[in-house]
A protein has these predicted regions:
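The beta1-alpha1 cofactor-binding region of Rossmann-like NAD(H)/NADP(H)-dependent oxidoreductases
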Residues: 40-41, 61-72, 104
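Residue(s) in the substrate-gating loop at a strand-loop-helix junction
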Residues: 142
């Protein structure tokens, strides 16, 4: 018997990377998972890859910055499964560079995906979870919210906002059995800066990485806590990644 048998989850950005890793961890434990993203090909590939797991995997193409599409995502999930136990707000965007060179388009795109997306997801999830007497929301943040990556002001600011949103939602949710938490990854997969520099902005060689499976296992731990317990915040990073002293 899986740890998530009978549970239903939505994972945004679930077609690849961290989101796919979390979706895999959930379906392997019997969860019915709906993955959402804009890229339909990645969604189709992820569904094909995860078929045959103990749980079920379905996809709904969704732009997390589009309010109408987000409302539809939750409506379709409820029509198919009748409940929602877990939401993972994972969709994310990165942009950066010297602050004097950044455009409003760059700034707004990161904020829309990284902040507006989780807000819309949480809003729709709260409507459902309040009625059913509880649920769990996991927001994917970043250690950038505490130790910023060099030349990353839009991304760093957005992840500070995600942490603030998480705390506010956790406060609102506690009277309704809704646990809200943030999972902050360090370097995962290809999170490396495009110019070859490390988080400090210096050329220091390849940075250590954790796998999407590591993220999946951690999200699973958070998702399978007893209903009256919440891991408000978790940080997952390579043992030898610069973190303390990073800046």
């Amino acid at each position: 018997m899986g740890q998530l048998d009978g549970k239903v989850a939505i994972v945004t950005g679930g077609g690849s990377g961290i989101g796919k890793g979390i979706a895999k961890a959930f379906v392997d434990e019997g969860c019915s998972v709906v993955i959402a993203a804009r890229d339909t090909q990645r969604l189709d590939d992820a569904v094909d890859d995860l078929k045959g797991s103990p749980g079920t995997i379905t996809s709904i193409p969704t732009d997390v910055t589009d309010e109408e599409q987000m409302v539809s995502l939750f409506s379709k999930t409820m029509n198919q499964f009748g409940r929602l136990d877990i939401l993972v707000n994972n969709s994310g965007a990165f942009d950066g560079g010297p602050v004097e060179d950044l455009t409003m388009e760059q700034w707004q795109r990161v904020m829309q995906v990284n902040v507006t997306g989780p807000f819309l997801g949480a809003r729709e999830a709260f409507k459902i979870m309040k009625k059913q007497g509880g649920g769990r929301i996991i927001n994917i943040g970043s250690i950038a919210a505490q130790k910023p990556r060099h030349s990353s002001s839009p991304y760093t600011t957005s992840k500070h906002a995600v942490w603030g949103l998480t705390q506010s939602l956790a406060l609102e949710g506690r009277d309704h059995g809704i646990a809200v938490s943030a999972l902050h990854p360090g370097n995962v997969m290809v999170e490396r800066r495009g110019d070859g520099k490390s988080a400090t902005g210096r050329d220091e060689g390849p940075e250590p990485l954790i796998s999407t499976e590591d993220m999946g296992r951690t999200a699973l731990l958070m998702a399978t806590l007893p209903a009256d317990a919440n891991m408000l915040e978790a940080i997952v990073l390579p043992v030898n990644q610069q973190y303390l002293g990073r800046g």
